[in-house]
Every structure is written in structure tokens, then in C-alpha cells.
Amino acid sequence: MERIERDTLGEISVDATKYWGAQTERSKRNFAIGDNPMPIEIIYAFAQLKKATAKVNAAEGKLAEEKAIAIGQVCDQIIQGELDEHFPLVVWQTGSGTQSNMNVNEVIAHVANLTLGEGQIHPNDDVNMSQSSNDTFPTAMHIAAYGALVTKLLPEITKMEAVLTEKKNKYMHLVKIGRTHLQDATPLTLGQEISGWEACLTNNKNYLETSMKAILPLAIGGTAVGTGLNASRDFGDKVAEELMKQTGYPFTSDSNKYFALTSHSPINFVHGAIRSLASDLMKIANDIRLLASGPRSGIGELEIPANEPGSSIMPGKVNPTQCEAITMVAAQVMGNDVTINVAASQGNFELNVYKPVIIFNFLESIKLLADSMRSFRVHCLEGLTANEKVIETKVNDSLMLVTALNPHIGYEKAAKIAKLAFDENTTLKEAAIKTGFVTEKEFDLWINPLKMTNL
């Protein structure tokens, strides 16, 4: 069953069970591209925005109070996820996001009119009052981006950080061999090594919390090209204040609306911090899977949980699957960063027209990282243990302990001891005594692996 909807191009039939109107239907038919829906976070952000603009327009005497209340009620339904099925459009549409803006306008008007009566609320004249797609879509981008960071990504960073803190403390006095250039180096403790991973999380959280302030200023109030045509002079300030009340986030009105419409450097900047997190997560996961390599022919200093059979042909194999998953996510996020960077450069004249692909990739990065960090934490990090016997053996076998002799006998003599031990496949102690450079007592006094860690 269908109904007829109308816009400036004429009539078009729409599924009678759906709440969208003519412009949404045209977009649905004209842009059957891929299967990437406009992120629902953007729809919810639009609903927050439309609720705020309705309140401000009513306060300014432009919109009837009854209409503002009806619009706000529908917006609440959208935010609560009750109307998700009525937002069918894909990311691959107009670069300004106009069609998704109109999708939201049409659904709000349609549902509100079910209560007020047909034709009472118009999607353009009422729901979109004092607005343009050109300032609403970038505003929705910032609302959605900030909310996703606060509710999804930052909590997962904190949780992973806490697990690493626990592991760090547990193994702070377990001496192991350090490695630089993939070669043996001087000793440190496993706790010290893990503290480096922990600091990666701590610092990246700080980078994000600092950078995300850049997306608090909003474009709303700029309307079509940044001049604020058809909106009151302080409309942006009032809407930002209302959004702050609704969300609890300290949004402000961007001081330069021309910038806010044509540049997405704030989003690009914040995603740079997200990319940095992805880089460090790849480093941490790679360290763990290499240190857990084996069990008999690899490094084998760490043991990871056996979550599932590792091979379809080799029985008993345990693979570092969580490490592999999160490193693939990290690679995807790095690719997303390239896309965002290129798209952010396309602010021709007064408007960037790559907005949907920017926010799509931004939100995807957050979701993938948050999900993979949760999975990695629960299924790998929490069950990660040290193979203390293997670690002790490798410390005792290491030639790099000779570095501790440098202050006592000099670099060249210490190097000769290490070379002799390597060439004759003996222990460092045996080689040191054989050279006559040190006595057994001196060796035992000066070669103290725990002391070498400077704990």
C-alpha cells in the first residue's frame, strides 16, 4: 500500500507504512549505492538538534509553542530508537548531507502531524526553520562525534588501562630480557615493559581529551553560506546553549561560521588522535603476540588464553586471534584517517561536500576501536600470564648482561667477553672468568639483572 507525497519536483509514491516524505524517497531511489546506511548516531544527533532549534524558534516567537512541543516529542522518540526504520538513506548521497537532513525533517513532520493533524507541521517551514542542511549536518557531525568519544571510546581506553595497571603491578619485579631492533638488549622487568603499554593508553586518552575540545564549537546559525541568512543573529549561541542542557556536553557556537561550513579540520584533528591510539594498539598487540610466540619454537615469555582451536589442520594449536583482530582494526582506522584527510581537503569555496563520508569513517573508527579493545581486553589481556621459567632461562642465557661490566672493565673488554661466550657457546660468566678480565666474585657482584633494571 502506498501514499502520494509531494515536493517541488512533483508527486511521488511512498510506502504507506513509512514516515518519510518525497525528498527522502527520491534520494532512496536515486542513490542505491552500497549498503552503508547513514550512521544512526547522526540521526540521533539531528534529533537533538531539531529539538533544540524548535525550542529556540518558539522562544523567539517564530514557531508556535504547540508545534515546538510536538517536534520535541518526536525528536525524543527518535533519540530513544523508536523510529530507526524510517531512516533508510545511505552515506553515498549529496556531500552536504541535505537528503538526510530532509529525511529527519520529513519524519518529524509526519509523526507530529499524526497528533496535530495533517499539514500542521511542514518539514521545511517548521522543522527546518532558521536552518540549512549546510549548518545542520556539520552540527550533527560534531554532536555525534563528541558523544561517541565520551560514551564509547574513552571508557574502553580507561578499562584497558586498568587491566594493564594490574598486570604491571603483578610483574613489576619479574626480570626479563629487553629487546631493541628485535635483538637481545639489557634487562628490564615485565612490569616495566607493561608500564610502557599502560602509558600508551594513558597518553592517548590525554591526546583525545585535549583534541576533542576542537569539535565543541558548532556550525548552527551559519545557515547556507555562513552569513546566518534567515536566522537571528544569536540563534547559534542559543541553540548551542540548549544542546548543552540536553546533552550535558559543553557545546558552543563557532565564532566563524564560514570556517564551520567549509572546513572539517576539527574532525580531522581529532581523528588524528584516534589514529595515534590505533598505532599504539597495533604496537601493543604485536608485542604480545610475538612474546607469546611458540609454544616451543618461539619466544614464549607470555601465555595467552586459549579461546578457540587455532587451526583446522594442526591439532592443539593456539593462535593470537585477539591480537590479529585488533591489529586489523588498527589498519582499518589508519585507512579511515587517509579518507578523512582527503575528504577534509575538499572544502571548495563556502562548503565542504564530503561531509557524510567524513563522519561515516570517523564513527566507524570509534566503533571498531571500542569493540576491538573490549574484545582484546576480555579475551586476551585479562587472562595474559607470564611464563616465568622461560623468562628466567632467557635472562640467564643473555649475552647483553655484559653491559653491566662496562663501567668496571670498559666497553672493549666487555665486548670481547660477549664475543667469546657467543663463539664458544658458553655462559657469560664462564667466558668472563676465562678472559681473566673479572673474577667470579666480581662477576657475581656486578652482574645483577634486577639491579640493572634500576627499580
Curated annotation (Swiss-Prot):
Its main location: cytoplasm. It is an enzyme of class 4 (lyase). Keywords: Cytoplasm, Lyase, Tricarboxylic acid cycle. Pathway: Carbohydrate metabolism; tricarboxylic acid cycle; (S)-malate from fumarate: step 1/1. Pfam families: FumaraseC_C, Lyase_1. The active site is at H181 (proton donor/acceptor), S311. One of its GO terms (biological process) is fumarate metabolic process. GO terms for molecular function: fumarate hydratase activity. CDD domains: Fumarase_classII. It comes from the Bacteria. One of its GO terms (cellular component) is cytoplasm. The keyword Cytoplasm applies. Coiled coil: none annotated. Its EC number is 4.2.1.2. The record marks E324 as: Important for catalytic activity. The keyword Lyase applies. It is found in: Cytoplasm. Substrate binds at residues 96-98, 122-125, 132-134, 180, 312, 317-319. It catalyses: (S)-malate = fumarate + H2O. There are 2 substrate-binding sites: the catalytic A site, and the non-catalytic B site that may play a role in the transfer of substrate or product between the active site and the solvent. Alternatively, the B site may bind allosteric effectors. Involved in the TCA cycle. Catalyzes the stereospecific interconversion of fumarate to L-malate. Homotetramer. Belongs to the class-II fumarase/aspartase family. Fumarase subfamily. This is Fumarate hydratase class II. It comes from Listeria monocytogenes serovar 1/2a (strain ATCC BAA-679 / EGD-e).
